[in-house]
């Protein structure tokens, strides 16, 4: 009986890609229903039958005015909410009604974003080897990953990973996971989808739970998809950003800063500490750990993609690091036009950045800069840090990092 003719090391080497994971395409989608922030306080207090809470409504108006959000998109229409009054109450059993929405609409919205990414990628969907699906909106078995696989007609053998209940940092998490998959599986093409719908968190106002109202003033619906792969075939694939490194950390003394709990009443949202202060206090350490090995200490010399959890977070990070206002332009644009879409936000920002960079005649997809950072902030308090390298817009070729 003949022995093996190859070693484990040879097999291992053959299994792995040569170059870094690269974002090859981006697609985004929102529900059709658009809500303008200036009109939202009146609408919100009317649909939840809370107009008698005049002082609370004034507080909510101030929250909306300070949010720096111009508009958001929401699957929940006035008609649907009128038919489901328990979803409009502050704490009424309503999980079944919420689940009925999200188990259908989360994969459907994800499909719309994925189809755009696949079209831009230009390769047959049969070449997708892995699917990473992320949502904080509901839980089901088989999951939204399974539903999307069926909807898109992906191969039954596609390797799926479903990530539920991660929260706002997860846009960084999915890129970190996709990087590992792409670099450790030669020829892999990873479809990453983040799809978020506020149907799980929508509820009426309460004097005793002002942090829930913060969420009502910020959250919007959206889905984003990216294709990630290493060693791109540049005859047909157009690299956008390289994923150079990725890490996750829990901030010290931050337990309970951001919590979400799935209950009969839906997903309840809690802000228990000074979240902007906690993030800005620790941001320099995350930047140093990520960029010191690269010899980068000037954080105005890199492009920025930061989860827009709210304007105060962005303001305090800018102040702490001494950032010029234009570094957060793409981030603030997405906050203004879509609100906080949880995990999908940073992928929307990448899309906005590469498009605006091309429109403005910049040399690279990263606003003319070579190196960049992507931050995700969320429950824990958890921070995801991804170091990115842009690609020249003129040639579309990758740069050796």
UniProtKB/Swiss-Prot annotation:
<dbReference type="InterPro" id="IPR018088">
    <property type="entry name" value="Chalcone/stilbene_synthase_AS"/>
</dbReference>
<comment type="function">
    <text>The primary product of this enzyme is 4,2',4',6'-tetrahydroxychalcone (also termed naringenin-chalcone or chalcone) which can under specific conditions spontaneously isomerize into naringenin.</text>
</comment>
<comment type="pathway">
    <text>Secondary metabolite biosynthesis; flavonoid biosynthesis.</text>
</comment>
<keyword id="KW-0012">Acyltransferase</keyword>
<dbReference type="Pfam" id="PF02797">
    <property type="entry name" value="Chal_sti_synt_C"/>
</dbReference>
<comment type="similarity">
    <text>Belongs to the thiolase-like superfamily. Chalcone/stilbene synthases family.</text>
</comment>
<feature type="active site">
    <location>
        <position position="168"/>
    </location>
</feature>
<keyword id="KW-0808">Transferase</keyword>
<dbReference type="GO" id="GO:0009813">
    <property type="term" value="P:flavonoid biosynthetic process"/>
</dbReference>
<keyword id="KW-0284">Flavonoid biosynthesis</keyword>
<dbReference type="InterPro" id="IPR001099">
    <property type="entry name" value="Chalcone/stilbene_synt_N"/>
</dbReference>
<dbReference type="InterPro" id="IPR016039">
    <property type="entry name" value="Thiolase-like"/>
</dbReference>
<dbReference type="Pfam" id="PF00195">
    <property type="entry name" value="Chal_sti_synt_N"/>
</dbReference>
<dbReference type="InterPro" id="IPR011141">
    <property type="entry name" value="Polyketide_synthase_type-III"/>
</dbReference>
<dbReference type="GO" id="GO:0016210">
    <property type="term" value="F:naringenin-chalcone synthase activity"/>
</dbReference>
<dbReference type="InterPro" id="IPR012328">
    <property type="entry name" value="Chalcone/stilbene_synt_C"/>
</dbReference>
<protein>
    <recommendedName>
        <fullName>Chalcone synthase 6</fullName>
        <ecNumber>2.3.1.74</ecNumber>
    </recommendedName>
</protein>
């Amino acid at each position: 009986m003949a022995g093996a003719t190859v070693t484990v090391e040879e097999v291992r080497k053959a299994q792995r890609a040569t170059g870094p994971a690269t974002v090859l395409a981006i697609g985004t989608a929102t529900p059709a229903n658009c809500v303008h922030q200036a009109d939202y306080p009146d609408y919100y207090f009317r649909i939840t039958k809370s107009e008698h809470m005049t002082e609370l409504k004034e507080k909510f108006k101030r929250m909306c005015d300070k949010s720096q959000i111009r508009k958001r998109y929401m699957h929940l229409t006035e008609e649907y909410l009128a038919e489901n009054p328990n979803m409009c109450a502050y704490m009424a059993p309503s999980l079944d009604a919420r689940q009925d929405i999200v188990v259908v609409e989360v994969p459907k919205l994800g499909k719309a974003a994925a189809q755009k990414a696949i079209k831009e990628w230009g390769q047959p969907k049969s070449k997708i080897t892995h699917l990473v699906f992320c949502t904080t909106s509901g839980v089901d078995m088989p999951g939204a990953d399974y539903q999307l696989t069926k909807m898109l007609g992906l191969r039954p053998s596609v390797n799926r990973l479903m990530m539920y209940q991660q929260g706002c940092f997860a846009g960084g998490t999915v890129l970190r996971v996709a990087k590992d998959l792409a670099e450790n599986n030669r020829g892999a093409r990873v479809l990453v989808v983040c799809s978020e719908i506020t149907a799980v968190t929508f509820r009426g106002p309460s004097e005793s739970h002002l942090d829930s109202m913060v969420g009502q003033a910020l959250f919007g619906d959206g889905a984003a998809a990216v294709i990630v792969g290493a060693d791109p075939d540049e005859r047909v694939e157009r690299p956008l950003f390289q994923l150079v490194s990725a890490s996750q950390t829990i901030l010290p003394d931050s337990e309970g800063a951001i919590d979400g709990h799935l209950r009969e009443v839906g997903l309840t949202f809690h802000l228990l500490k000074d979240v902007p202060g906690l993030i800005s206090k620790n941001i320099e350490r995350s930047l140093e750990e990520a960029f010191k090995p690269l010899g980068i200490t000037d954080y105005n010399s890199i492009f920025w993609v930061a989860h827009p959890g709210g304007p105060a977070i962005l303001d305090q990070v800018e102040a702490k690091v001494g950032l010029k206002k234009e570094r957060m332009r793409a981030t603030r644009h997405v906050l203004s036009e879509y609100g906080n879409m949880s995990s999908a936000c940073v992928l929307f920002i990448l899309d906005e950045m590469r498009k605006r960079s091309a429109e403005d005649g910049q040399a690279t997809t990263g606003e003319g800069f070579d190196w960049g950072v992507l931050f995700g902030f969320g429950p824990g308090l958890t921070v995801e840090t991804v170091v990115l390298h842009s690609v020249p817009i003129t040639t579309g070729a990758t740069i050796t990092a």
